[in-house]
């Protein structure tokens, strides 16, 4: 996995769990990640701070996890989608007999920047607004299709 090193002081927003790394905050990469690849983010002092999808542009990394040992795999997607679903169920949006339409995933609001999932009865509609979410779309779909 490629590593992204931040300029000194640019980790402060990530310490407050901001979901993005802007391109201007990056000092250098160790290698040349492809768009959509998961990269690890390190401070200027080489301390791990987060991992996320890399993309060329002003938002260079969309953070998926602040835990170094958390793999971005099928279990990750199942867990994140289950958390989103349970939150909506607990407030009466999902499993509501008077409404079968709701937004399951609100991107950054559900710690999944670049991803939107809307539920219409037994149909899920996914929008991938980043290269990484686009690349992971089939794994995300497999994780959600069991519920819909």
Over which residues does each language-model region extend?
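RNA-binding accessory domains that recognize and position tRNA/RNA substrates
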Residues: 1-147
């Amino acid at each position: 996995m490629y590593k992204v090193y931040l300029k000194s002081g640019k980790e402060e927003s990530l310490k407050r769990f901001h979901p993005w790394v802007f391109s201007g905050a990056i000092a250098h990469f160790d290698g040349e990640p492809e768009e959509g690849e998961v990269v690890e983010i390190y401070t200027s002092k080489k301390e791990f701070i987060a991992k996320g999808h890399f993309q060329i542009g002003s938002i260079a990394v969309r953070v998926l996890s602040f835990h170094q040992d958390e793999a971005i795999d099928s279990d990750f997607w199942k867990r994140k989608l289950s958390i989103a679903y349970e939150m909506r169920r607990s407030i009466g949006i999902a499993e509501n007999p008077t409404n079968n339409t709701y937004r399951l995933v609100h991107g950054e609001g559900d710690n999944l920047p670049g991803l939107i999932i809307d539920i219409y009865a037994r149909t899920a509609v996914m929008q991938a607004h980043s290269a990484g979410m686009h690349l992971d779309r089939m794994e995300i779909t497999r994780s959600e299709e069991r519920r819909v």
